[in-house]
Amino acid sequence: MKMAIVTGAARGIGLATARFFVDQGYQVAMVDRDEDALDAAAASLAGGTAFVCDVSDPAAVDEMVAAVLAVSGRIDCLVNNAGVADFCSIEDTSFARWRTVMATNLDGVYLCSRAVLAALKQSRGSIVNIASISGLRASTLRVAYGTSKAGVIHLTQQFAAEMGEFGIRVNCVAPGPVRTKLAIAVHSQAIIDAYHDAIPLNRYGSEAEIAEAIVFLGSEKASYITGQTLAVDGGFGSTGVGLPALRD
């Protein structure tokens, strides 16, 4: 049975992605640093196994990958979904705050991807990184977050360029506004209205819609796609419209 690793799998897009992989007949290694939430998520999903790990810790990542291989003997897909959201002005973004964002959002993607390469060479598998539309276009209050996600997009291309000769595909999904619990909690009505006005489809995406794109890129259905970033954003990136509501 094929094995997919999904980081940040305790909730949201990561959990939705794990469910879709299970539906496709995969075993899923569900990775997160929030042990309680991860255990609850894994208990709700037949075919999912919890692996507690902080992806910004190199030793912890190596241990996690070794543990997954001990269980499954193979890795066919890695989804680098773990991330932290941080919205702060440039002047108020300390270097410590900057590094906290980079450690998970960019370093974690590099560490996990590098750790699975030997296994993916054997399976001729794939990596799907989760960036953001904030990595494709600049916006206010996202100096660390947006830069980290832009780094993920370029890292995707670097890995694709170098790993293609081994049959490893590496792609990226850049979600637009998604109706997650976090978004519902932190987005004011003014922000929601502004997004709706700027999105041609006039709504937020769902976790399931993002997960569908991730699983597609990770599967053999995308066998001739590598080094690409797929914006799943309802057309938001095509409008070129700024959102004044996000300045507050």
Enumerate the language-model features and the residues they cover:
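Alpha-helical segment proximal to the catalytic Tyr-Lys
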Residues: 118, 161-165, 223
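Residue(s) in the substrate-gating loop at a strand-loop-helix junction
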Residues: 132
